[in-house]
Design a protein with these regions (language model features):
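Surface-exposed beta-strand edges and their flanking turn/coil or helix-capping segments
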Residues: 69, 77-82, 91, 118, ...
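Glycine-centered flexibility sites
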Residues: 79, 85, 148-149, 180, ...
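A general structural motif
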Residues: 137, 141-149, 167-179, 197-199
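Feature captures the catalytic cores and cofactor-binding loops of soluble hydro-lyases/lyases
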Residues: 171-248
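Short, basic/aromatic-enriched C-terminal tail that caps enzymatic domains
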Residues: 246-256
Length: 256
């Protein structure tokens, strides 16, 4: 991969990412910048990811303002409500509707947030399944290749089957979208693995725990609070996942 992998150099219009099929409307825009390299300067045309703010409204009350790519907004809303405890499960969702930069949802939770509960899932996953999932991310992250400005997240089912893949400018929104997409498609969270490119903070661990997903993996690093929360919830937490190495900080029994 070239050093300036996310730009189209004026003299090198054949760069590989420009030839890729990309159907993610509103994901990026083209701007001009100046490259300074030593004493040389030149004008470049580059793609940058688009960040927008959307309001999430549940039962007539705004519960969050989310910063995100302006795509997969229904999945974002559903995932956020599940990952933040506004819904106990996908069965509590009555409806979700996108109207411009607002997402209107109805639920059966009565406005009461739930707490994450420790998991007793006996799910097992092999390191190779994790590495194959990271290969999927590398292949599927088209917006990242165009812009260098997104995080990715995916959800695996049993035996490494792909349930969902999502990109977003926010690592939290990428996780929300991936979880929402997977659960809307019928995935069983207790038999699922969440893999992300972002660091494993307590906020990200909490999202997985709230959704009922027992295994969380990242190719980035963990934070101490994320490790402590994973231990309290009985989750498996692994980081710095790069073939052939996988570093497990909690719940090593789920890694085959």
């Amino acid at each position: 991969m070239k050093e300036s992998w996310h730009v189209e150099r004026v003299e090198e219009a054949e760069e590989f990412w420009r030839g890729e099929r990309l159907d993610r409307g509103g994901a990026f825009q083209t701007v001009r910048c100046t490259e300074i390299s030593g004493s040389e300067r030149r004008s470049l045309e580059v793609d940058v990811a688009i960040e927008e703010r959307v309001a999430l409204i549940l039962d007539g009350m705004m519960v969050a303002e989310l910063f995100c790519l302006p795509s997969q907004l229904e999945e974002l809303a559903v995932g956020h409500l599940l990952c933040e405890g506004h819904l106990r499960g996908i069965e509590d969702l009555v409806s979700a509707r996108v109207a411009g930069k607002e997402i209107f949802c109805e639920g059966r939770g009565g406005g009461m947030k739930v707490e994450a509960r420790p998991t007793a899932s006996d799910l097992r996953i092999s390191p190779e399944a994790v590495f194959k999932a990271l290969d999927m991310i590398n292949d599927a992250a088209l917006v990242w290749r165009r812009t260098g400005g997104t995080h990715s997240a995916l959800v695996l089912g049993e035996e490494g089957a792909l349930s969902s893949f999502c990109e977003d400018v926010s690592r939290s929104s990428a996780v929300d979208k991936a979880v929402g997409s997977a659960l809307m498609a019928g995935a069983d969270p207790s038999r699922s693995v969440l893999i992300t490119t972002g660091r494993l903070s307590s906020a990200i661990v909490s999202k997985a725990g709230m959704a009922g997903i027992p295994v969380l993996v990242s190719r980035a690093g963990p934070l101490n609070a994320g490790i402590e929360l994973a231990e309290r919830l009985g989750m498996t937490l692994a980081a710095f996942a790069r073939r052939p190495n996988l570093y497990v900080y909690a719940g090593k029994e789920r890694i085959l």
